[in-house]
Amino acid sequence: MEKCSHESGRHSAENDGKYDITGSTATNVVDGFTMVAVGDVIVSRTLANGHHPGFSEIVELLRAADVTFGNMETLIFDIRSFNGTPQAEYGGAYHVSLPEIGPDLKAMGFNIMGRANNHSLDWGVEGMRETSRILDESGIIHAGVGESRAQASAARLLETARGRVALLSCATSFTPMSRACDPAGEAPARPGVNALRLERSVVVEPDMLESLRKIRDALPNPGPKHDDREMLVLAGTTYRTGKDVGYTYAANTRDLADILRNVRRGKQYSDFCIFTNHAHEPGNWSEEPADFEQALARKLIDAGADAYVGHGPHRLRGIEIYKRRPIFYSLGNFFYDDLRTPVGADMYDVYDKDPQVDTDAEVTAAEETMGYPTAAGFIGALAEPVYYESVVAVSRFEENQLAELRLYPIELGYSKRLANRGVPSLAPRPQAISILERLQRLSEPFGTRITIEDRVGLIRL
């Protein structure tokens, strides 16, 4: 892509000729500014110069943008010299990548990446820190983890020819012990992720709630009883009455206020602001975002964000355009090159494998086929084609607003052998049309109209 000077073509947000005394949050990029956004980057080896058919076309898309974003959902270190350990709390698998991944991602075109997710501390603080070191040395800006909450929640800045870009990254899906905190009194800070805590409630019909109340009251030591006839707590789960049975979420007010302030702060120091959130809620099975997410995305844009990029469920969810800003509720998987090794002793145990008999690859295959363990059994298997289909989203901005969004359907080699699948290529026409028609259906409830030209989705404003 042709790069223009930082001043040429700029539609500057002037304060009516007045001096900026408050710290403006207006967007201020050169016309033609482009952002590429993709979903989860789960990659274990170098690929930029590899033999994977069709991947070079994807790299061309990544390299052509001013800013290219992905969710960094792995840790990078050399296991031979690593001084950390796999944690008892982990994100469902111990993701690990070779140190060469950092320079390789940079060579592909990635220059900015989110770090806050449920895998950020799979290998402890040591894994988090080593990944940060390698990304820093590779020249990739990253946000969402740090030595304190203040560091993890802060905007990180990328200089481009068309404007300065701020990135903020948070996770609503995270392992409890990975949440960062700031110092208080004599207690030091805790390293970890920028977490947005959610309170989940199960919505049930009134007669269901009464049945649950009877169960609660029959249990020994049921705990304090509330007179509220529309809510109760049973075995640590909150139940509420409502019209539609399902799940509802409420964001922690302190976390949300801190995040909104940091978005405002990040935008005051930049020309363009990306906010990214890792959200599996209500579950990987759902094509729709959880009920908190639309309000969250809109509040973030109101606070100064120019794009909201969601990821987590490993599948596509809908797209909304709000105030001429894109909201991607999930961009699914971009890489699912899950050749991780070592997988850790806990993974062998979970999938009833023997490290003296079975292999890391066989553990990974079992995990992807069976899913993750819960009290009710295994759930969340990722062995369906939908998890190997996504899009590369290319947003072009004119006059500081979204002018066009191009959606390039990709497929990740669902039917290939384990050693070869998980690397994206442009989807063949029939599959591309199917992916885009699904995205049309998922985006329609948000009032978004996607047209299909050849095998590319288009949103024009």
UniProtKB/Swiss-Prot annotation:
Intrachain S-S bonds: none
Region Disordered, annotated ranges: 1-21
Transmembrane segments: none
Presence of the UniProt keyword Ligase in the record: no
Keywords: Plasmid
UniProt family annotation: Belongs to the CapA family.
Protein's job: Could be involved in the biosynthesis of a cell wall component.
Protein name in UniProt: Uncharacterized protein y4sH
The organism's taxonomic lineage, starting at the top: Bacteria, Pseudomonadati, Pseudomonadota, Alphaproteobacteria, Hyphomicrobiales
